[in-house]
Amino acid sequence: MSQEKKVFKTEWAGRSLTIETGQLAKQANGAVLVRYGDTVVLSTATASKEPRDGDFFPLTVNYEEKMYAAGKIPGGFKKREGRPGDDATLTARLIDRPIRPLFPKGYKHDVQIMNMVLSADPDCSPQMAAMIGSSMALSVSDIPFQGPIAGVNVGYIDGKYIINPTVEEKEVSRLDLEVAGHKDAVNMVEAGASEITEQEMLEAIFFGHEEIQRLVDFQQQIVDHIQPVKQEFIPAERDEALVERVKSLTEEKGLKETVLTFDKQQRDENLDNLKEEIVNEFIDEEDPENELLIKEVYAILNELVKEEVRRLIADEKIRPDGRKPDEIRPLDSEVGILPRTHGSGLFTRGQTQALSVLTLGALGDYQLIDGLGPEEEKRFMHHYNFPNFSVGETGPVRAPGRREIGHGALGERALKYIIPDTADFPYTIRIVSEVLESNGSSSQASICGSTLALMDAGVPIKAPVAGIAMGLVTREDSYTILTDIQGMEDALGDMDFKVAGTKEGITAIQMDIKIDGLTREIIEEALEQARRGRLEIMNHMLQTIDQPRTELSAYAPKVVTMTIKPDKIRDVIGPGGKKINEIIDETGVKLDIEQDGTIFIGAVDQAMINRAREIIEEITREAEVGQTYQATVKRIEKYGAFVGLFPGKDALLHISQISKNRIEKVEDVLKIGDTIEVKITEIDKQGRVNASHRALEE
């Protein structure tokens, strides 16, 4: 990489974009500093000197949010950044997906992309800056990379598309779309939307691609100026004679029939047996440890299986389980299967099954998100778990990984637009989707299961949501789009295009591909085919439960809303929180108080809610002119008595207002602790209350 500092500038969505090379991180294979407005990201690309064994490309993308970038000190005892949060993990995945297909086939060197956010301007997306930085770091390095690529964020406000909307604009946008690609095609899409149509989504994607093309041209100019020398990479060549022999054996032993097996586990077992039979043909009795040859034969077999699956789909329009290209697997669903939970839904599609379980909590149970932006209170959460047994395997039980975090976030995006507002449903909602069986499209099964759980729980959602995953097999001059892909089609196909939405429109999409990019024609056809599939699944779900239940579970907390004057909030809280803690200790309720005076009281026991409400009403109660009260004498003065109307509110009962008869001394008729009925006659501008007993005698 060049050791001389060079600076390149352009404009991006009305803000300055600067890329600097040659000054920082010079021992990395490639490094750039991206300045976008006040956002600054350092992106580096490093590759190992030797390739790794295995049949996969070891690419790792990291995205690190440094709290100093937003002028914050990390929380916790150690006061330093820990493991990446969910948002950082999702951004790393977002960058990985458009970059991964653009490395040479067979390249097995470890490649690590590091993105460090050094300064964060919320209106100048650090995520999109890091995507451009990752592309540029690879492009100016000696690592073989068929880029550059770029990514943009697209919003949709009042019928107009916007590139990289500000935080304020995102609040009112019907679309939050991230799209990436190279000059000729789109190769990554991620979006959340408020029921927008397929045509609106298509236009948004290619509106974004126009800006991507300009950014790619800018990057290419930098590459042409720097002229990096790339590593020479020559893929290993197959022994054609060996390939032909293995191919002949697979035909002999019925590869087509082995692939065309409905049951996933049976198919996998049959393929393993077929491979073992063929490998045995090559084991030299005199040299049983000929591992290189055996490894080569296995690699050829895997390629032949892939070719056969793709040939069957593209040429014969037959899928491994016998379905047509646009056919959905058998569907089954149930609700209310877990009696003590607040809501549950079981959704099964073929050999993929998800159990979604919903829990309702008080508003105070929200998740606090403390990242580079302002603190955020999240009251709807969707979590996704993928245990080993779901694919018939064993292994260590670990914390959720990148894939589980990503699938959980996709489901959350798909569902958050149908979640009712706090005013209509004052609860925190958490859904956990447990994948019990998987043969592809488990993330979309979790979306369907979560919709069932929401309706089973009685959450007044705006509309049901269903999800489906689309696949693609391309040939030189043709392509076949697949509806509801299974695991083998995902692994051996060219695309995984997930689409979720209501009957009216799309709420989330996610597209990953293994080829260079997709044309407008393919994306348009895939969206339409997904719409038809989504509606078919929706109709099935509505036969199980057609609307949210009218009552919550008996085990769910009940939430009552009441309103007090904002200046009374301090009375309810008390000094150091003393009063509110007393209420909670006595009743066991959860109390959430908003700045506008709205109070949410939550508990399973309605009697405890009622008691908490009574206490708050007593604390915040105000005297009213004309009302009568049973008051208690608290203090006696020469000019009258101070009487307590109710806790926290006293009134002056003037000596002239005690009786219609003349009184010489207050003590002659009243003593401390006496009860006397009074009527409120005046409340002055300072809030002082005057009362009268005489008015009740006249």
UniProtKB/Swiss-Prot annotation:
It comes from Staphylococcus aureus (strain NCTC 8325 / PS 47). Involved in mRNA degradation. Catalyzes the phosphorolysis of single-stranded polyribonucleotides processively in the 3'- to 5'-direction. Mg(2+) binds at residues 490, 496. It comes from the Bacteria. Homodimer. Component of a possible RNA degradosome complex composed of cshA, eno, pfkA, pnp, rnjA, rnjB, rnpA and rny. Interacts specifically RNA helicase CshA and RNase J1. SMART domains: KH, S1. This is Polyribonucleotide nucleotidyltransferase. GO terms for biological process: mRNA catabolic process; RNA catabolic process; RNA processing. Pfam families: KH_1, PNPase, RNase_PH, RNase_PH_C, S1. Disruption phenotype: No visible phenotype. Its cofactor is Mg(2+).
